[in-house]
Amino acid sequence: MMPFGKISQQLCGVKKLPWSCDSRYFWGWLNAVFNKVDYDRIRDVGPDRAASEWLLRCGAMVRYHGQERWQKDYNHLPTGPLDKYKIQAIDATDSCIMSIGFDHMEGLEHVEKIRLCKCHYIEDDCLLRLSQLENLQKTILEMEIISCGNITDKGIIALRHLRNLKYLLLSDLPGVREKENLVQAFKTALPSLELKLQLK
């Protein structure tokens, strides 16, 4: 068996990267592989199953409609009829989900809550994509975005398109600087929204 150092050294050689960068690039490459959308898989098993596989592969958890328990083990995803398990909530705490994977969410029709906490690969593009998905515009009721350092005002303001959003928690987001503008934009677009800001 080849040691990790040799493998990553070979990967760096292929990409012509300096050895000191190999670990960072290796993990970035691996996370991109985990996030890659397989449209054939979505067609074969349905959007909820394919999205569950993506989320769990990246370290997130899902809870299905009508169930109390969070599903966090990829190897114990439930089997059965494709339309039986519908994702109701997503907890992406400490996960490696990134924008290239967000097309997995396109067919989801029952997601009510999303928690993004310490997601180092989440950027404004992710929130923009999320807010453009018509199904999610209708179903998402609650969102929490905590300690995601790459999120700025641009990404947050896009969430005003989630027209049934009732609760939004924003905490420890150093890239969010225009708090007053955000508050005003959400008051105008979503007057019944409970907006909680824990920002500096």
UniProtKB/Swiss-Prot annotation:
LRR repeat positions: 62-87, 88-116, 117-141, 142-173
UniProt KW keywords: ATP synthesis, CF(0), Hydrogen ion transport, Ion transport, Leucine-rich repeat, Magnesium, Membrane, Metal-binding, Mitochondrion, Mitochondrion inner membrane, Repeat, Transit peptide, Transport
Main location: mitochondrion
Source domain of life: Eukaryota
GO terms under biological process: ATP biosynthetic process; proton transmembrane transport
UniProt region (N-terminal domain), positions on chain: 1-61
UniProt keyword Acyltransferase, yes or no: no
Compartments in which it is found: Mitochondrion; Mitochondrion inner membrane
Listed GO MF terms: metal ion binding; proton transmembrane transporter activity
Extent of the transit peptide: 1-25
Coiled-coil segments: none
InterPro entries given in the database record: LRR_dom_sf (IPR032675)
Positions with a binding annotation for Mg(2+): 59, 93
Gene Ontology cellular component annotations, sorted alphabetically: cytoplasm; mitochondrial inner membrane; mitochondrion; proton-transporting ATP synthase complex
Protein family (similarity comment): Belongs to the ATP synthase subunit s family.
Subunit structure of this chain's protein: Homotetramer. Associates with ATP synthase.
Function: Involved in regulation of mitochondrial membrane ATP synthase. Necessary for H(+) conduction of ATP synthase. Facilitates energy-driven catalysis of ATP synthesis by blocking a proton leak through an alternative proton exit pathway.
Name used for this protein in its record: ATP synthase subunit s, mitochondrial
